[in-house]
Amino acid sequence: MHNASDIQSALVPMVIEQTAKGERSFDIYSRLLKERIIFLVGQVEEHMANLIVAQLLFLESESPDKDIFLYINSPGGSVTAGMAIYDTMQFIKPNVSTVCIGQAASMGAFLLAGGEKGKRFCLPNSRVMIHQPLGGFQGQASDIAIHAQEILGIKHKLNLMLSEHTGQPLEVIERDTDRDNFMSATQAVEYGLVDAVMTKRG
């Protein structure tokens, strides 16, 4: 019986490159990493976040003055995992250009907006969704109250940061993230989540 990750890794294409020492094979993501392209695909969770952070730090060490391109196709996920990626994007020296392919929802949308101003893009048929952080807790009433306070604090912090990245007033962000708020690529530009819709490579 194969698990999902075995099947997924079996489907990752390999590319062959000619070198002075002969042929060398790379999986497609490693080959694209050489071009300073990182893929953020699927649920944002701790393991994936650690891999993205490691790639960002590696590319900074390789060429601190060259842009990094982060392609996002994600339904969102863990706030703490997402913030690890976000903080690293802001911390490193290279500009991080973000590109939405498919969808950038929830934490995916937050990371999309967190790219370098002027270098945040959507492809024409992608969609973006913003909303408030989700929480589902069980346990004693006092513990649930603690978690509720924590999630309200996180919500306010994320709204402040989205306000900064989009240029929208805080009260507009608070209203628009109260429920799932879907946007087309063009609407995401109008809102300030991205800077342009990219139809062709420049």
Swiss-Prot record:
Active site: 106 (nucleophile), 131
Keywords: Cytoplasm, Hydrolase, Protease, Serine protease
One term of GO molecular function: serine-type endopeptidase activity
GO CC term (a single one): cytoplasm
Top-level enzyme category: hydrolase
Subcellular location: Cytoplasm
Entry's family note: Belongs to the peptidase S14 family.
Entry function: Cleaves peptides in various proteins in a process that requires ATP hydrolysis. Has a chymotrypsin-like activity. Plays a major role in the degradation of misfolded proteins.
Protein name from the UniProt record: ATP-dependent Clp protease proteolytic subunit
Organism whose genome encodes this protein: Shewanella sp. (strain ANA-3)
Higher taxonomy: Bacteria, Pseudomonadati, Pseudomonadota, Gammaproteobacteria, Alteromonadales
Name of the encoding gene: clpP
